Amino acid sequence: MFIKCYSGGGRLLLEETLKSCPIVKRGQYHYFIHPISDGVPLVEPKLLREVAMRIIKIGNFEDVDKLVTAEAMGIPLVTTLSLYTDIPYVIMRKREYKLPGEIPVFQSTGYSKGQLYLNGIEKGDKVVIIDDVISTGGTMIAIINALKRAGAEIKDIICVIERGEGKKIVEEKTGYKIKTLVKIDVVDGKVVILRD
């Protein structure tokens, strides 16, 4: 099932596109702008396919009822994964719908604070959490807290890109292990691959 999507020269497309993506500075923070994390400048199907196949290769999708992500950039990932695995997905939204059983949870990241709202999860659901980037861990902690309140069983957690200490923070605070496809940093205005 796993398809290798090489960019040429034997490198995987995700790593190649990360190394060449633009960097913008906001305050003291350097943001990398990448199709998987931002949807700009353009999301190529072969990149999305590669990322989905790599997630499927490392993930535990046996007996999973639902995939879970937070809006916005996890949406293309869970949509693609759902098409490959036939597992439905749930999106934690930034907007309240006031549906019965809706679970609000506070989210604090390096750049924003606010509420996320979980719908569509039932007690006992076996879920896999998917996200595009883990950096501070704030979004992931919010997702985990909401799923625990709903009574879901978290089978696996996979983020495409790891940056900073968020993975370690989430693992220490929640006890859940997080898998990532690539670890990066921004050094001298460029993305550096620390681990792939």
UniProtKB/Swiss-Prot annotation:
Cite the SUPFAM superfamilies for this sequence: PRTase-like
Task: Give the EC class as a word.
Answer: transferase
Q: Which UniProt keywords apply?
A: Cytoplasm, Glycosyltransferase, Purine salvage, Transferase
Under which pathway is this protein filed?
Purine metabolism; IMP biosynthesis via salvage pathway; IMP from hypoxanthine: step 1/1
Indicate where this protein resides in the cell.
Cytoplasm
State the superkingdom.
Archaea
The alphabetized list of GO BP terms reads: IMP salvage; purine ribonucleoside salvage
User: Could you give one GO CC term from the UniProt record?
Assistant: cytoplasm
Q: Which reaction does it catalyse?
A: IMP + diphosphate = hypoxanthine + 5-phospho-alpha-D-ribose 1-diphosphate; GMP + diphosphate = guanine + 5-phospho-alpha-D-ribose 1-diphosphate
Any one Gene Ontology MF annotation carried by this entry is: guanine phosphoribosyltransferase activity
What EC designation does it have? Answer: 2.4.2.8
Family under the similarity heading: Belongs to the purine/pyrimidine phosphoribosyltransferase family. Archaeal HPRT subfamily.
Q: Which HAMAP family match?
A: Hypx_phosphoribosyltr
What does the subunit comment say? Homodimer.
User: Function of this protein?
Assistant: Catalyzes a salvage reaction resulting in the formation of IMP that is energically less costly than de novo synthesis.
Stated name of the protein: Hypoxanthine/guanine phosphoribosyltransferase
